[in-house]
């Protein structure tokens, strides 16, 4: 604290000894007086003990600092108030308390009676910025600048705008109150809510429609319009005492007798827990469904699959031989690998080894041919296989073809039709008539496909390169001897479709000179006379 006191006195001495002082002799006397006071104080401190000296020094130092702070406040206030003119119109006191520029309280150190808490008036706020941020830095001439005077238009109507409430036409009920929208909570609809609402709306619509129809019928019948239609009209019927299916046998359920005598749950009951499943019957269209074909493979892919299959079979065989399940096979010796397989034995006696190798090759060839002969089908087996294929084709679904041929006097044409029909196992008839010829085929899907191609593509019906049995002079004539112009011969497909059963038991040719003979024969064969009528009404222009 002594050090602080010395610094304070030194600063006072410097101030007193500054060149700005007006009276230098007085300053020298002041210095001498202060030096004398300092020496006396030091002498007094030397006589005081150290503990008391520290306490007195602290108290004296605190008092000196407070005095110095108060002096600085007074000087600052005087200097600040000297630059600002005292004008009541520029500043005004704030009755609410001291506030800063940003509505922040002034530091307690600066709160003094000499510092005025001021706030800018609205007039000054227009021409200057906020005092808190910019007013402190304004110079004196800016603060003293008078407000700008705006010239008013003398022709401008300065009368105050009338209030809406003062109008005689104002209705206070039209005043809208400010409506605030309240917050809404998140609401999740339950599952099936709107479905139930839609069903309820449909039921209500049906009920309204029912009411309208009942009202319309009652009006037509002359019933009063006040007919009450309630929910009872569409309600459930009451449960009868006995079901309608039991009425022909009993009149009341009490006629059954004692329940203990019933043969329903006992061992003699014909009712059990077994379920009878009927035999499934495929529909007709299921038989003609095209079979699913495997994916088509290229030649390279086929070779790869064959190679992999053979490698797997060879690997399995080698595994069985290693496990001792099968005996190992002797080496397959050929003339090309003779030296590689036999080695030293082939070098010792090449002639003998070559003869043995040729013998093994011949044995392998004979064994291969014998196995092929064993796998080959006998003539009876081939015939049985052909019949089985035909039956399988027919079992998949029967189809029918009806052709109308203009001329059929050429024998090779009849021969091709007859042979192909028998080979494919088709049933039907070929009716020869002077007007036109009718051919009917009944067979499976595959056979029908081949016969259709035969009749429409393979046979040239205008070809007469070979003579016919009934030809005369290399000319084709009909049964009555009339010459035929085969260049006009045609073959048309009249009808094609599926049939449920065969109408003919076998394939045959039938000569019918008249139309009645053809119709009567077809009627005898299962009612196929409609084919004749269909072919007769056929027109090539259609």
UniProtKB/Swiss-Prot annotation:
CC terms in the record's Gene Ontology section: cytoplasm; mitotic spindle; nucleus; spindle pole; spliceosomal complex; U4/U6 x U5 tri-snRNP complex
One Pfam family of this chain: PRP3
Keywords from the named record: Cytoplasm, Cytoskeleton, mRNA processing, mRNA splicing, mRNA transport, Nucleus, Spliceosome, Transport
Region ranges (Disordered): 1-32, 151-191, 290-329, 367-388
InterPro entries recorded: Pre-mRNA_splic_Prp3_dom, Prp3, Prp3_C
CDD domains tied to this protein: Prp3_C
GO term, biological process aspect, one: mRNA splicing, via spliceosome
Protein origin, superkingdom: Eukaryota
Subcellular locations according to the entry: Nucleus; Cytoplasm, Cytoskeleton, Spindle; Cytoplasm, Cytoskeleton, Spindle pole
Composition bias, Low complexity: 10-22
Major location (coarse): nucleus
PANTHER family: U4/U6-ASSOCIATED RNA SPLICING FACTOR-RELATED, U4_U6 SMALL NUCLEAR RIBONUCLEOPROTEIN PRP3
Function: Participates in pre-mRNA splicing and in nuclear mRNA export. May play a role in the assembly of the U4/U5/U6 tri-snRNP complex.
Subunit structure: Component of the U4/U5/U6 tri-snRNP complex.
Name this polypeptide is given: U4/U5/U6 small nuclear ribonucleoprotein prp3
Record organism: Schizosaccharomyces pombe (strain 972 / ATCC 24843) (Fission yeast)
Gene: prp3
């Amino acid at each position: 604290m002594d050090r602080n006191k010395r610094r304070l006195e030194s600063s006072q001495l410097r101030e007193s000894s500054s060149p700005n002082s007006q009276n230098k002799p007085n300053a020298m006397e002041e210095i001498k007086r202060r030096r004398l006071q300092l020496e006396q104080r030091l002498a007094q401190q030397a006589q005081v003990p150290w503990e008391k000296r520290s306490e007195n020094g602290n108290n004296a130092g605190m008092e000196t600092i407070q005095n110095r702070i108060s002096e600085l406040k007074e000087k600052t206030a005087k200097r600040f108030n000297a630059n600002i003119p005292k004008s009541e119109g520029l500043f005004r006191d704030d009755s609410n308390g001291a506030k800063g520029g940003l509505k922040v309280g002034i530091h307690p150190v600066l709160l003094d009676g000499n510092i005025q808490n001021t706030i800018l008036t609205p007039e000054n706020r227009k021409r200057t910025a906020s005092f808190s941020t910019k007013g402190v830095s304004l110079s004196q001439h800016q603060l003293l600048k008078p407000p700008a005077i705006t010239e008013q238009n003398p022709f401008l109507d300065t009368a105050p705008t009338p209030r809406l409430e003062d109008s005689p036409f104002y209705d206070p009920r039209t005043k809208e109150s400010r409506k605030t929208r309240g917050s809404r909570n998140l609401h999740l609809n339950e599952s099936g809510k709107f479905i139930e609402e839609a069903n309820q709306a449909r039921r209500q619509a049906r009920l309204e429609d029912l009411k309208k129809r009942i009202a319309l019928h009652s009006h037509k019948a002359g019933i009063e319009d006040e007919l009450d239609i309630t929910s009872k009209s569409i309600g459930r019927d009451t449960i009868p005492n006995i079901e309608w299916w039991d009425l022909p046998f009993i009149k009341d359920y009490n006629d059954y007798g004692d329940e203990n005598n019933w043969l329903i749950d006992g061992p003699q009951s014909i009712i059990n827990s077994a379920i009878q499943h009927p035999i499934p019957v495929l529909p007709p269209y299921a038989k003609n469904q095209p079979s699913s074909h495997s994916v088509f493979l290229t030649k390279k892919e086929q070779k790869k699959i064959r190679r992999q299959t053979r490698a797997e079979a060879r690997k399995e065989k080698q595994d069985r031989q290693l496990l001792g399940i099968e005996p190992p096979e002797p080496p397959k010796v050929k003339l090309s690998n003779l030296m590689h397989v036999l080695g030293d034995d082939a070098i010792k006696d090449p002639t003998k080894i070559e003869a043995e190798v040729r013998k093994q090759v011949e044995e392998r060839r004979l064994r291969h041919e014998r196995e092929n002969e064993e796998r080959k089908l006998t003539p009876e087996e081939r015939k049985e296989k052909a019949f089985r294929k035909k039956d399988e084709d027919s079992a998949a679904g029967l189809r029918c073809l009806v052709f109308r041929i203009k001329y059929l006097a050429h024998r090779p044409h009849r021969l091709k039709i007859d042979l192909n029909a028998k080979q494919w196992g088709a049933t039907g008839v070929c009716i020869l008539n002077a007007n036109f010829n009718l051919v009917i085929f009944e067979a499976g899907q595959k056979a029908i496909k081949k016969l259709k191609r035969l009749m429409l593509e393979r046979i040239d019906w205008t070809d007469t390169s070979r003579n016919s049995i009934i030809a005369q002079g290399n000319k084709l004539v009909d049964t009555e001897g009339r010459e035929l112009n085969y260049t006009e011969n045609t073959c048309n497909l009249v009808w094609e479709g599926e049939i449920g059963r065969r109408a003919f038991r076998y394939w045959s040719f039938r000569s019918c000179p008249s139309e009645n003979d053809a119709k009567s024969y077809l009627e005898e064969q299962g009612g196929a006379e409609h084919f004749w009528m269909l072919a007769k009404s056929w027109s090539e222009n259609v």
